[in-house]
Amino acid sequence: VFHATEQVTDSIQVKGGEFVANYPNQLIYIPQRHQLLSYNLNENLYSIFDPYTQCWKGTQAPVKEHDYWNNTLVYNPSNSSLVSFGGYGHYHYNNKLLISYPYENTPQRHINLTNIHPRYSTSSVLVDSTLYIFGGRGCPSGRQELSPRNYYDLYSVNLFTQQVNKLWEAPQNP
């Protein structure tokens, strides 16, 4: 923990609960809720860290290997959902858009964005109901052994209609 006013760092000893992320890149701070949220997209598990009790509120441990290494994920404050795109797992890149609802009992939505090649290590930002996705590494087939490449392109995805638009693309080696 970084204390900005004192310019010092501190550690919090976790006393209990389940951290549901099975790998370190499945954690997000949600400023609108002042919460640290651990997530597991394969199993649709979530756990909130309570800094006062120093415990994770999750009770179920993850058991599956996941398919979303180095995905991009944003919090959507309009409906309290998590919006994820892409990732890597089991020797495949993916182009799945996942919309998850950690604060309510709503099924996770899986949408294949076939207009975008499968990839991981993308960047994204949410502006109103539009998700912008930039770059990444992957390949058209999604199979890691078939000539992966870096992407330098920008897409917009309307979260209501799932309409995908390619806004621009730079050369492969800018």
Please give the residue ranges for each predicted region:
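Entry beta-strands of beta-propeller and related beta-repeat scaffolds
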Residues: 33-37, 79-84, 129-134
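Beta-propeller and closely related beta-sheet repeat lectin domains
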Residues: 23-27, 69-74, 118-124, 174
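Hydrophobic/aromatic beta-strand positions that recur at structurally equivalent sites within the blades
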Residues: 1-4, 29, 39, 48-51, ...
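Beta-strand-rich domains and repeat architectures in extracellular enzymes and scaffolds
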Residues: 1, 14-33
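Short coil/turn linkers that define WD40 beta-propeller blade boundaries
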Residues: 6-7, 44, 54, 80, ...
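Beta-propeller blade signature
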Residues: 46-51, 94-105, 146-163
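Short, conserved, GDST-rich strand-edge loop motifs in beta-rich repeat architectures
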Residues: 85-89, 134-150
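Beta-propeller fold detector
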Residues: 5, 10-15, 50, 57-63, ...
